[in-house]
A protein has these predicted regions:
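Glycine-rich, positively charged N-terminal anion/phosphate-binding segment
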Residues: 1-76
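Alpha/beta enzyme core
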Residues: 12-15, 61-98, 102-137
Length: 137
């Protein structure tokens, strides 16, 4: 949840007993281009752990290349965002727009999982639209 799940929010959650927190979504392409603001989203303090770092993108190679950069921050797991419905995300083919292409979703998950030393999870929606529920594909 961009702009919500920052460090202070995660610390509040863990202080109230949350068993796992998540970073704001991090652009794999931003990491590809070594964007400092993107990298800053991955900073995790000991009080926020266990913490997952959530990445998004639509290119398997760039998503896989993001993993070593993500691992510099030692997350307990990596979450792939394939569920964000925000227009600025889906208009680039990222987030929930990937629900229209289950084959590409599989390639992205495989690319990330193949290089990740920590568990990988995926955030999805039940489908791109109400008339096409394809989450089980």
């Amino acid at each position: 949840m961009a702009g919500i799940t920052d460090g202070p929010f995660r610390r509040i959650c863990t202080s109230w007993g949350a068993g796992l927190t998540y970073s704001e979504m991090v652009s794999a392409k931003g990491l590809w281009y070594n964007d400092k603001k993107t990298a800053d989203l991955m900073k995790i303090t000991p009080e926020e752990r266990p913490c997952a770092i959530q990445i998004f993108g639509s290119e398997p190679e760039i998503m896989a290349a993001a993993v070593p950069k993500v691992m510099e921050f030692k997350p307990e797991l990596i979450d792939i965002n394939m569920g964000c419905p925000a227009p600025k995300i889906v208009n680039n083919g990222d987030g929930s727009a990937l629900m229209k292409n289950p084959e590409l979703m599989g390639k992205i998950v495989r690319a990330v999982a193949d290089v990740s030393p920590v568990p990988v999870t995926v955030k999805i929606r039940k489908g791109w639209e109400d008339t096409r529920v394809n989450a089980v594909e």
